[in-house]
Amino acid sequence: DPNVAFYSVVAVICWQYIPFYMIFFIAALSNIPQELYEAAKIDGATQGQYFWRIELPLLTPSIKTACILSLIGSLKYFDLIYVMTEGGPSNATELMATYMYKNAFASFKMGYGSTIASAMFLIITTAGIFAYFVTRRKEE
């Protein structure tokens, strides 16, 4: 079933990367100075205000970095999907990387596979540069 294949791959990828992002965000949270929480407590802030006015603004660079890592990682993901489904039933889990591999090495269309790999390189590089310019800090 294509739906089962897709959701099983998503579940395994989440299982693989959630610990990384948990440690990433725990490290970012531990870098928030305790003085900010103490000052907010003295000012009478609620738990919601702690999150919206202290934590979220200070976690924004970490959130942006995590989004960039997720975006670029998802564009070049290959090994797990190929091992689990080889592109899946009815191409349900087909990615550019698995499509490139099938054309270049299974069908021996090296030129076409090379073209797909070049397109992947351009897309990933463009996405990375775009994400860099969107998320960089504005210097004042």
UniProtKB/Swiss-Prot annotation:
A GO-annotated cellular component: plasma membrane
Alphabetized Pfam families for the sequence: BPD_transp_1
Topology in membrane: Multi-pass membrane protein
Xref: InterPro entries: ABC_transporter_permease, MetI-like, MetI-like_sf
Biological process, per Gene Ontology: transmembrane transport
PROSITE patterns: ABC_TM1
Membrane-crossing residue ranges in chain numbering: 9-29, 65-85, 115-135
The UniProt record lists the keyword Membrane: yes
Keyword terms of this UniProt record: Cell membrane, Membrane, Transmembrane, Transmembrane helix, Transport
Intrachain S-S bonds: none
CDD domains reported for this sequence: TM_PBP2
Compartment(s): Cell membrane
UniProt key word Transport: yes
Main location: membrane
Residues of the ABC transmembrane type-1 domain: 1-133
Source organism superkingdom: Bacteria
Known function: May play a role in sugar transport.
Family as reported in the entry's similarity comment: Belongs to the binding-protein-dependent transport system permease family. MalFG subfamily.
Name assigned to this protein: Putative ABC transporter permease protein ORF1
